[in-house]
């Protein structure tokens, strides 16, 4: 009896050492915890196996079998964790399947480039270039003609300004001469009317008759 109790104590110490070398329960997210009932039943099975064998060697082999069984259980728990991790979808993949695709982004620069390319290809570029050259030549020639006309008008305007200034001076001189002549005529009329009244009146009548005849002929 004492030998059986000591062997059972040795088995418990060996199981405790083996159990302490296994990975922690907390590191396994989905591992099933070992309760006290499971531990007691496990101890009973070990004691029953050791009593039936009747030798220490057979007990050692049973303990090694138990250690291997625990390692297999741990591996199965790890496989189960991997299966659960693969089975649970990631948060990045939890997008709704009916979400609409925004589609490709509109490339403005590409659109402009394609439009210009089509316009160049559709038109005769050489003809357009020649037409542009002719138009530039016509514009340049007309610009030169306009410049010549402007220069001529400037010179002509200068001449007219000089003539106008000269004509203004001449008209002022003529006006002064006319005023002087009018004064002289008035002076002579006054003198003749006083000194020669009969001759003055006869001459005046002749002048008036001549004017009347000219008006009648017209």
From Swiss-Prot:
Record region (Disordered): 1-65
Subcellular location: Endosome
Coiled-coil ranges per UniProt: 142-192
Composition-biased stretches (Low complexity): 39-65
Cited InterPro entries: BLOC-1_subunit_KXD1, KxDL_dom
Segments of skewed composition (Polar residues): 17-30
Keywords associated with the record: Coiled coil, Endosome, Transport
GO biological process: endosome organization; regulation of protein localization
A cellular component annotation (GO) from this entry: endosome
Function: Component of the biogenesis of lysosome-related organelles complex-1 (BLOC-1) involved in endosomal cargo sorting.
Subunit structure: Component of the biogenesis of lysosome-related organelles complex-1 (BLOC-1) composed of at least BLI1, BLS1, CNL1, KXD1, SNN1 and VAB2.
Classification via PANTHER family: BIOGENESIS OF LYSOSOME-RELATED ORGANELLES COMPLEX 1 SUBUNIT KXD1
Extra information: Present with 1630 molecules/cell in log phase SD medium.
Family: Belongs to the KXD1 family.
Name of this protein: Biogenesis of lysosome-related organelles complex 1 subunit KXD1
């Amino acid at each position: 009896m004492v030998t059986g109790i000591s062997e059972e104590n040795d088995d418990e110490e060996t199981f405790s050492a083996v159990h302490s070398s296994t990975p922690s329960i907390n590191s396994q997210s989905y591992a099933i915890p070992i309760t006290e009932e499971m531990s007691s039943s496990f101890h009973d099975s070990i004691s029953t196996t050791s009593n039936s064998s009747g030798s220490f060697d057979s007990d050692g082999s049973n303990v090694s079998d138990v250690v291997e069984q625990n390692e297999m259980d741990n591996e199965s728990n790890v496989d189960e964790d991997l299966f659960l991790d693969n089975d649970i979808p990631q948060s990045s993949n939890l997008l709704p399947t009916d979400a609409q695709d925004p589609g490709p982004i509109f490339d403005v620069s590409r659109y402009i480039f394609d439009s210009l390319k089509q316009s160049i290809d559709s038109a005769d570029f050489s003809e357009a270039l020649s037409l542009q050259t002719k138009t530039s030549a016509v514009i340049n020639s007309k610009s030169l003609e306009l410049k010549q006309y402007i220069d001529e008008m400037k010179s002509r305007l200068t001449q007219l300004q000089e003539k106008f200034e000269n004509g203004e001076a001449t008209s002022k001189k003529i006006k002064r001469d006319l005023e002087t002549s009018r004064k002289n005529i008035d002076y002579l009329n006054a003198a003749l009317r006083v000194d020669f009244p009969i001759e003055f009146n006869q001459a005046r009548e002749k002048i008036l008759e001549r004017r009347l005849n000219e008006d009648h002929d017209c």
